[in-house]
Regions:
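Short, small-residue-biased leader/transition segments that mark boundaries at the very start
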Residues: 2-9
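Short loop/turn motifs at secondary-structure junctions
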Residues: 4, 36, 67-68
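N-terminal beta-loop-helix "entrance" segment that forms/cooperates
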Residues: 13-25, 30-33
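Active-site cores that bind ATP or allylic diphosphates and position pyrophosphate for catalysis
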Residues: 43-409
Length: 409
């Protein structure tokens, strides 16, 4: 971006995979700032917990609306620009053919990822099927594609305003997305989470399903993360503040039970079939993760189930998705933290941003109105659910959004 500075947008306390982050957004913001980021902005929950398509669209909108960002840098497994652009063109110009092929493949019993791969291989005869299939097998590459699509859409809408975004794909190195190997220099996020969330067989606390093993946050962590991030997460683990999805099991069950008569079909990523399965199997509910595994089917992935259940928990409905692709979708920019020596960036955004900039939660009521304020309050409610769950886990009250200061380093 201009001025030689960089900002980062963070997904909230809840993630695109349909699970909570293991550490709260303020701790992760501090990690990002100490790791070199100049400014951290929050992606609202409706986008942060959505599928890759909407998640990427929200991220591009958020950065574009700062008025100062000119380049989006993202990681991918294989930065094959030519193949990415070819796929983006197919998805943009041959969307109906693509959807027809995907639908046909899924009717034959193939899950969506396989149907997507089959459709794109058919529509891209100039590339070998092995190359296309291998590219699509990586979740990071899928997100990279969605970023490219979102950037193309942003540029087509904003070209008259001379505010064009470019992309800079960076090839990831080290372990793969699903690798669980620890003690290596470039471990996957999965491996880091597993190292932190290893259950202790000797812990007799059964009030929640996740117990932190006293030694698990030390072995290999300093090899896998920068020193500042490793020490912050180690301290978090020592305080028993790390959360996994099963920490929200009771909250999810009570929510599903309360919706028994209404059903869940109106919630984002759910639909009538999944709503019916939820109703059928609710009596067998033991935990968030167990119930998601129970509900998965050949045509519905575990991640999709988790995302649907999270949307039910966070009250994100199909109607909320209507705004996700709209050019004016992101209604505000909320600052989670910044470096003191990069205040020039914050000043530039205050001057150039096309939507209100929120640096203090208490000021939002006088700055935001209508749907913008409604979305903000929803984000506050999501954060409060995460905070309350953490507070109950350690039996200590934690500061809410109105008392949580902005992170400065």
């Amino acid at each position: 971006m201009s001025r030689g500075l960089g900002d980062v947008y963070k997904r909230q306390d809840f993630l695109q995979r349909g699970v909570p982050a293991i550490a709260d957004k303020y701790t992760r913001t501090r990690m990002a700032l100490l790791g070199g980021a100049d400014l951290v902005l929050e992606l609202p929950a409706v986008w942060a917990t959505a599928s890759a398509e909407y998640f990427a669209a929200g991220g591009v909108q958020l950065l574009g609306k700062t008025g100062v960002v000119d380049t989006l840098c993202y990681g991918c497994e294989t930065p094959e620009k030519e193949l990415m652009q070819a796929i983006v063109e197919v998805l943009s110009k041959n969307a109906s053919d693509y959807q027809m092929l995907v639908s046909s493949s899924m009717k034959q019993g193939n899950p969506f990822p396989a149907a997507r791969s089959h459709a794109l291989c058919s529509l891209l005869p100039s590339f070998s099927s092995d190359v296309v299939s291998s590219f699509l097998a990586s979740p990071n590459n899928i997100l990279a594609l969605e970023y490219e699509k979102a950037i193309a859409r942003w540029n087509s809408i904003n070209s008259v305003h001379d505010h064009i975004l470019s992309s800079m794909p960076v090839q990831r190195i080290g372990e793969g997305y699903h690798s669980t190997k620890t003690g290596v220099t470039y471990a996957s996020a999965t491996a880091i989470r597993n190292a932190l969330l290893t259950p202790s067989e000797n812990d007799g606390n059964h009030n929640h399903s996740m117990c932190i093993s006293t030694g698990s946050y030390d072995f290999g962590l300093s090899q896998m993360l920068p020193d500042t991030s490793a020490s912050l997460l180690a301290a978090f683990a020592q305080q028993n503040l790390l959360l996994d999805m099963d920490a929200f099991s009771f909250a999810l069950y009570t929510r599903l039970w309360a919706l028994h008569d209404e059903g869940c079909a109106d919630f984002a990523d759910c639909g009538k079939d999944l709503s019916h399965r939820i109703d059928q199997h609710l009596e067998h509910f033991l935990s968030f993760s167990q119930f998601a595994d129970l509900l998965k089917s050949k045509n519905t992935t575990y991640t999709r189930i988790c995302r649907a259940l999270l949307h039910i928990l966070l009250n994100i409905r199909q109607d909320d998705y209507a705004a996700l692709w709209q050019p004016d979708g992101i209604p505000y920019l909320r600052v989670l933290g910044f470096r003191r020596d990069s205040s020039v960036l914050l000043s530039a955004i205050k001057k150039e941003a096309s939507v209100p900039l929120i640096t203090k939660v208490a000021d939002a009521s006088s700055i935001l109105h209508g749907i913008a304020y409604k979305r903000f309050l929803h984000d506050v409610a999501c954060a409060d659910l995460y905070r309350t769950t953490s507070s109950m886990q350690i039996q200590t009250e934690l500061p809410n959004e109105y008392r949580q200061p902005i992170v400065l380093v």
